[in-house]
Amino acid sequence: MDIDPYKEFGATVELLSFLPSDFFPSVRDLLDTAAALYRDALESPEHCSPHHTALRQAILCWGDLITLSTWVGTNLEDPASRDLVVSYVNSNMGLKFRQLLWFHISCLTFGRETVLEYLVSFGVWIRTPPAYRPPNAPILSTLPETTVVRRRGRSPRRRTPSPRRRRSQSPRRRRSQSRESQC
């Protein structure tokens, strides 16, 4: 089977492969980031988003892979074979997990569309011959280029909603407090 873990999110393995391997933080740093930013949602029994689900699965699979590699390292007598296993896990599997964790954390942090635009613009930049491309690579940011940042000072006058535009109070439109705080 040829399964692309990014397909349902509008990306592909090839699109992420344009980013160099040293672009992605270590798995430990990514796991710490996911825990710091999204621990409540990841540990919640409720479904928050497909990105949360994918992150949960990646974190569980990484834990299983580490358990397996620890077992192999403990039970493999030949040091050369042990080093080959560790090297393979770190270079091949480690990179795949770093890409997967980075993608889903970035989508939750910046928004899926922003991440996809970044991947496309980086892919175009990296394939452009150095003589014809700008010296700096695109940067993933929460602020699109068209955003205008206002100077400090008086904030603009806020509009109060008119009575005609009240939100419906029907039960199907209300959200539970616990879900809002976790996701």
Swiss-Prot record:
Residues 177-183 are annotated as: RNA binding. The keyword RNA-binding applies. It comes from the Viruses. Residues 149-176 have a biased composition (Basic residues). GO terms for molecular function: DNA binding; RNA binding; structural molecule activity. One of its GO terms (cellular component) is T=4 icosahedral viral capsid. Transmembrane segments: none annotated. Keywords: Capsid protein, Cytoplasmic inwards viral transport, DNA-binding, Host cytoplasm, Host-virus interaction, Microtubular inwards viral transport, Phosphoprotein, Repeat, RNA-binding, T=4 icosahedral capsid protein, Viral penetration into host nucleus, Virion, Virus entry into host cell. The modification Phosphoserine is found at residues 155, 162, 170. Its main location: virion. The keyword DNA-binding applies. Residues 155-177 are annotated as: 3 X 8 AA repeats of S-P-R-R-R-[PR]-S-Q. Sequence repeats lie at residues 155-161, 162-169, 170-177. Homodimerizes, then multimerizes. Interacts with cytosol exposed regions of viral L glycoprotein present in the reticulum-to-Golgi compartment. Interacts with human FLNB. Phosphorylated form interacts with host importin alpha; this interaction depends on the exposure of the NLS, which itself depends upon genome maturation and/or phosphorylation of the capsid protein. Interacts with host NUP153. HAMAP family: HBV_HBEAG. Self assembles to form an icosahedral capsid. Most capsids appear to be large particles with an icosahedral symmetry of T=4 and consist of 240 copies of capsid protein, though a fraction forms smaller T=3 particles consisting of 180 capsid proteins. Entering capsids are transported along microtubules to the nucleus. Phosphorylation of the capsid is thought to induce exposure of nuclear localization signal in the C-terminal portion of the capsid protein that allows binding to the nuclear pore complex via the importin (karyopherin-) alpha and beta. Belongs to the orthohepadnavirus core antigen family. This is Capsid protein. The gene is C.
